């Protein structure tokens, strides 16, 4: 899909949004497909009013009990909700940064703020999976120190399963039990 979209985007100017954000991203080497998706999600992602109370509860919990957020979502919901948290975008930023494990957001599939970071096509997922062991090693240090709460997606998600599998392969049985006690799925 991305290759077809990119070819059409270059050949048909009417397909382009002509937003500076998109044009700058493409000029810097980003795929038009990723740039347009990032722009669209930036513009259209708005919290639903019917979730206002739940969002406020999550914000209140974070002030006392939430060390960090790990998400596969591209949008900026968590950055806006927890504006004092530091976001780490993509595996490279997470793996090669000196993280503290407190007040941080780990956007493992990228972010709309960095369109080229989006894990969205087959090649992106292959690269993501190839580097999965490095990500798992970094996350393991966080998981062993802090409780883990999964919000919004199932533990049946293949990306989550792969990360957990990679972590479990590195741990002795007593540490696996400790990790299991720290997992909570909402």
Stretches with model-predicted labels:
Residues 1-122, 131-146, 155-186:
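Conserved catalytic-core helix/loop/strand module for nucleotide-ribose chemistry
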Residues 128:
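Short helix/strand-bridging catalytic loops that position acidic/His residues to coordinate divalent metals
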Residues 152:
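Active-site loops and adjacent core secondary-structure elements that bind or stabilize anionic groups
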């Amino acid at each position: 899909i991305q290759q077809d979209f990119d070819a059409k985007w270059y050949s048909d100017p009417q397909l382009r949004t002509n937003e500076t954000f998109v044009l700058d991203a493409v000029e810097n080497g980003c795929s038009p497909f990723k740039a347009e998706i990032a722009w669209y999600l930036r513009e259209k992602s708005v919290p639903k009013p019917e979730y206002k109370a739940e969002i406020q509860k999550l914000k209140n919990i974070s002030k006392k009990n939430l060390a960090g957020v790990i998400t596969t979502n591209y949008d900026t919901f968590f950055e806006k909700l927890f504006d004092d948290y530091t976001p780490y975008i993509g595996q490279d930023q997470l793996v090669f940064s000196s993280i503290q494990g407190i007040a941080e957001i780990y956007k493992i599939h990228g972010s709309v703020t960095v369109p080229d970071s989006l894990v969205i096509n087959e090649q992106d997922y292959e690269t993501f999976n190839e580097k999965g062991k490095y990500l798992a090693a970094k996350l393991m240090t966080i998981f062993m120190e802090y409780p883990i709460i999964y919000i919004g997606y199932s533990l049946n998600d293949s990306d989550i399963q792969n990360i957990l599998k990679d972590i479990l392969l590195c741990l002795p049985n007593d540490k696996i039990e400790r990790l299991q006690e720290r997992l909570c799925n909402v």
